[in-house]
Amino acid sequence: MNLVRTAMLLAFMTALFMFVGFLIGGRAGMMIAFVIAAGMNFFSYWNSDRMVLSAYRAQQVDERNAPEFFRIVRDLARNAGLPMPKVYLYDSPQPNAFATGRNPENAAVAASTGLLSALSAEEVAGVMAHELAHIQNRDTLTMTITATLAGAISMLGNFAFFFGGNRENNSNPLGFVGVIVAMIVAPLAAMLVQMAISRTREYSADRRGAEICGNPLWLASALGKIARGAAHVPNEDAERNPATAHMFIINPLSGERMDNLFSTHPNTENRIAALHDMAQSGMNVSTSPARAANPSRKSRSVPDTGLGRGGSQPPKGPWS
């Protein structure tokens, strides 16, 4: 079913891309847009995960430089019956995380240094279980391709003003009005698609993530902390790449952006309430992150992934 939804998404995004091309350059513009969209669809399938990880300058970590974090992901993946995903950290003070990849065999999970600083090991386990649930539900392909194409469509809508605003250009059937329509409609339509695919999937990933980690309250507690952190700590890379916002466990964009007029995520309080209801329904809860993980608290630093921005060291945290 996810394959059908992904195909429908690609078809819609391609049609939207062609529509903007038509408004800019008539039939010729529409055909050029079709060729570009077809190439982007092919490229996105194979490379969109790398593009997203690169946009956040995420660095891959392993058991040598992030032993406890890596072990938590490994044990959770075992609980879920998933292949071990690649594990990444990206330098950002905002606590957040996302998953990407075209299938479970080629998946990756990424967490911010701020997440490891702000959350306990149990809460981190809840977050990573949520991301593994997205991988298991095969949401990551759709979410990653949407991020790539939505960003391209928004950019095309902005470029429409510069490349399609020539009143003497007879190839544009709607003239300057059509260009204005493209500037407004294209980014809005892309944002609505992001909302549609993200909101319904977050609840499903929350539920499955709670089952994977064994305790819904870990994820509930983590969501509260991440939401408060995201509200006060900006994510500069996300602000520059708002099309990726729906990939994160909590919307990383600040409230100052118009992008937040239509949220890509369901209300955090409702998600937390659903997890509390799940815990109260009698679900067997675990007391340690994942089945085989029992993180020690001897380490007091975030795993070393190199210098942070401006040559500074990443912020210190309660565990690694």
UniProtKB/Swiss-Prot annotation:
Residues that, per the record, bind Zn(2+)? H130, H134, E202
Gene symbol here is: htpX
Q: Which Gene3D superfamilies match?
A: Metalloproteases ('zincins'), catalytic domain (3.30.2010.10)
What are the subcellular locations of this protein? Answer: Cell inner membrane
Membrane topology qualifier: Multi-pass membrane protein
Which cofactors does this protein require? Zn(2+)
Report the NCBIfam families cross-referenced here. Answer: PRK01345.1 (NF002363), PRK03001.1 (NF002826)
Upper classification of the source organism reads:
Bacteria, Pseudomonadati, Pseudomonadota, Alphaproteobacteria, Hyphomicrobiales
The record's remark on the cofactor is:
Binds 1 zinc ion per subunit.
What Pfam families does the annotation carry? Answer: Peptidase_M48
Question: Can you quote a single GO CC term?
Answer: plasma membrane
What name does the UniProt record give this protein?
Protease HtpX homolog
Quote the EC number: 3.4.24.-
Matches recorded under PANTHER family = PROTEASE HTPX
Write one Gene Ontology MF term.
zinc ion binding
Please tell me whether the keyword Protease is annotated for this protein.
yes
Concerning PROSITE patterns, the annotation shows: ZINC_PROTEASE
